[in-house]
């Protein structure tokens, strides 16, 4: 790998048990006509797995430069905020005061353009994304380009989905990019055997001249900070509209817009589709527990299922499975 610069990780976290935070959230919910399908309680629910996120990073990605741990202000009581690789960032440290407080993950993530010390190359995690096996820098960046999958996928409207937000992203992408030119300039990046059966999607969508959407596999995204800045300069109005939303709203954008921009620009290197997998937690998390044992995928997303009947019981099973996989404390934990 040539000219590889340092790579940072960024992860966002919320403590839904923080009394003050819950009180403020409740007060603002009364003022705003929020979309429940985009702001359900499950989207804020904390599973007690954050310490295992750090243990996984230390074990499987010790090469990481800095970890930007972004919160409203609270930190887990076990976290050593003085760790040399850890940068604890409060919302007030990089988001303009006029947009605070915010309970909108899109505001938190899209404001990364204002995080001055963040490396040009970084990987954005949600707190439900876990490294599940040894990874290299080249799994995320190669020749200074992000690793990703250039797979087309039409948008399908579903209840309780992000489709309205993704549609806003795609409207901007179609404003600046021509599918014909994308394929003329980067054909091999979109028709690549690394995509496996998903390659059929690109073949089937060839007759359509417009970009109908991209496949989102819900794993950490590799970003170049300069791409965030480029899109912000061109579309600052929609950024600022998003920043004003205290809660997620159907009129805004999310960070996938920058991912789509990188894909449409050809500024990426194709990555094997089996690098990561998205799992939805259900009443029976056996498939996730088995994945933790077998490590078939290097990255996993453990997506909160909104139909869990016994949250505490399932949470206990998950914590037990992670404890078995990562029994040793990381250096990010207080002694």
Curated annotation (Swiss-Prot):
**Which keywords annotate this record?**
Exopolysaccharide synthesis, Transferase
**Matches recorded under Pfam families:** Stealth_CR2
Which residues are connected by disulfide bridges in this protein? Answer: none
Task: Keyword check for Transferase, yes or no.
Answer: yes
Its GO biological process annotations read: polysaccharide biosynthetic process
InterPro entries from the xrefs?
Stealth, Stealth_CR2
Cite the GO molecular-function annotations of the record.
transferase activity, transferring phosphorus-containing groups
Keyword Transferase listed? The answer is: yes
Q: What is its EC number?
A: 2.7.-.-
- Please name the top-level EC class of this enzyme: transferase
Q: What else is known?
A: Stealth proteins are part of a protein family that is conserved from bacteria to higher eukaryotes. Family members were first identified in microbes as proteins that help pathogens to elude the host innate immune system. Microbial stealth proteins are involved in the biosynthesis of exopolysaccharides. Stealth proteins are predicted to function as hexose-1-phosphoryltransferases.
Q: Which protein family is named in the record?
A: Belongs to the stealth family.
PANTHER family reported for this sequence = N-ACETYLGLUCOSAMINE-1-PHOSPHOTRANSFERASE SUBUNITS ALPHA_BETA (PTHR24045:SF0), PTHR24045
Q: This chain belongs to which protein, by name? A: Capsular polysaccharide phosphotransferase WcwK
């Amino acid at each position: 790998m040539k000219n590889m610069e340092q790579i940072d990780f960024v992860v966002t976290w919320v403590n839904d048990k923080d009394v003050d935070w819950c009180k403020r959230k409740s007060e603002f919910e009364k003022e705003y006509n929020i979309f429940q399908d985009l702001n359900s309680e499950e989207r804020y629910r904390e599973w007690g797995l954050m310490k295992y996120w750090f243990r996984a990073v230390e074990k499987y990605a010790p090469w990481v430069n800095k970890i930007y741990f972004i919160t409203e202000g609270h930190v887990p009581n076990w976290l050593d905020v003085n760790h040399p690789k850890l940068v604890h960032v409060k919302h007030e440290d990089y988001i303009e005061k006029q947009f605070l407080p915010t309970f909108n993950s899109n505001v938190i993530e899209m404001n990364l353009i204002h995080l001055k010390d963040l490396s040009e190359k970084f990987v954005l995690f949600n707190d439900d994304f876990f490294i599940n096996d040894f990874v290299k820098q080249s799994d995320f960046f190669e020749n200074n380009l992000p690793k990703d999958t250039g797979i087309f996928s039409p948008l399908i409207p579903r209840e309780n989905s992000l489709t309205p937000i993704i549609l806003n992203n795609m409207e901007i992408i179609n404003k600046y990019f021509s599918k014909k030119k994308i394929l003329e300039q980067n054909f091999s990046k979109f028709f690549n055997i690394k995509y496996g059966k998903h390659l059929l999607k690109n073949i089937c969508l060839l007759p359509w001249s417009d970009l109908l959407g991209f496949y989102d596999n819900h794993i950490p995204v590799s970003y170049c900070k300069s791409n965030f800045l480029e899109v912000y300069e061109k579309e600052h109005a929609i950024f600022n509209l998003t920043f004003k939303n205290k809660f997620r709203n159907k009129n805004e954008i999310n960070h996938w817009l920058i991912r789509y921009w990188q894909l449409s620009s050809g500024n990426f290197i194709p990555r094997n589709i089996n690098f990561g997998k998205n799992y939805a937690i259900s009443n029976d998390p056996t498939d996730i527990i088995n994945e933790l044992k077998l490590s078939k995928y290097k990255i996993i997303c453990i997506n909160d299922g909104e139909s869990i009947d016994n949250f505490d019981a399932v949470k206990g099973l998950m914590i037990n499975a992670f404890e078995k996989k990562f029994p040793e404390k990381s250096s990010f934990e207080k002694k």
